[in-house]
Every structure is written in C-alpha cells, then in structure tokens.
C-alpha cells in the first residue's frame, strides 16, 4: 500500500522524473501499473534496474528493504526509506520534515550522502502534539503507548 500512496503523492506534487521505475518483490513481478499516463511493468530489484537512478524510494516491508537497499547504494542512488528498515543502520539520517518546520530548522540537503529514513507518522504526530503543548505550559513527563494496528500483522486476504 505504501508504494501506491508514494506513487500518487509524487504524481500530485509533480515530482520531476524523466524515468520512473516500479520495482518490487517476486509477488508483484510482471504486474502492469501506470506511472502518469504510461503503463509500465513492475520489475525485480536488480542492479541493472538501478543504473542511472537518482533517487530510490523504499516503500516495501522492512525485511525486503534490508535485503535490497545496498544495491541502490552501490548504484549511486540517493535512498529515501519509508519502510523504517534502515533507521538503526550506521550513518542513516532520520528526518521528520514537519518537526523540522515546527522547530524552524532548515537542515542542509546533502545529495549523494547517507540514506534518509523518514520518521514514523505516529512519532511525528506525537512530537508535534508535545511541541505545541509545550508552547502552552511546560511538560514534565509524557508517556505514550502506541500499538500497531492488528491489520498490519494479519495476512492479506486471498
């Protein structure tokens, strides 16, 4: 689902792309999808499919990202991890653009640098809430318990 959402957001924001490739695991290989108005086949993640790719977005499950991200790095692609698989890897930059904006932080953009892992939406929402509450009064302690939706653990119907 994340891949489809990513594709829609990139299209809505007019992400400047000359060649968009849809790569996925074995389960999706050969399926036809569209990028813009053009039909395209979903291909496997192989080094030759990553040649001359400026940005690689990982929106798959964590295990698949862990098993394939080095191919993108070796191909010289900038990596944006939306699967949260790389957040504990050495040298990976954890980013939360909404939080950065709320704090007035303008981070330097280093293309060709470390992979970027985007903070989990639940963490971003909690951080925004706490930052805004802190503007009203000081916070001495905050305890948050976030449970993963059961639907994330259940096998897909089929």
Predicted regions, residues:
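N-terminal Rossmann-like NAD(P) cofactor-binding subdomain of oxidoreductases
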Residues: 1-158
């Amino acid at each position: 689902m994340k891949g489809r959402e990513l594709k829609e957001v990139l299209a809505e924001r007019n992400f400047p792309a000359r060649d968009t490739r849809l790569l996925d695991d074995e389960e999706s290989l050969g399926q036809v999808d569209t990028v813009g108005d053009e039909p395209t086949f979903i291909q496997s993640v192989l080094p030759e499919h990553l040649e001359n790719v400026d940005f690689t977005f990982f929106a798959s499950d964590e295990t698949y990202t862990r098993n394939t991200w080095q191919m993108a790095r070796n191909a010289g692609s900038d990596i944006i991890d939306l699967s949260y698989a790389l957040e504990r890897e050495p040298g990976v930059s954890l980013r939360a653009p909404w939080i950065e904006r709320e704090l007035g932080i303008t981070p330097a953009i280093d293309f060709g640098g470390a992979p970027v892992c985007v903070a989990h939406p639940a963490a971003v929402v909690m951080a925004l809430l706490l930052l805004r509450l802190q503007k009203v009064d000081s916070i001495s302690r905050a305890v948050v318990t976030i449970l993963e939706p059961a639907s994330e653990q259940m096998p897909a119907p089929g």
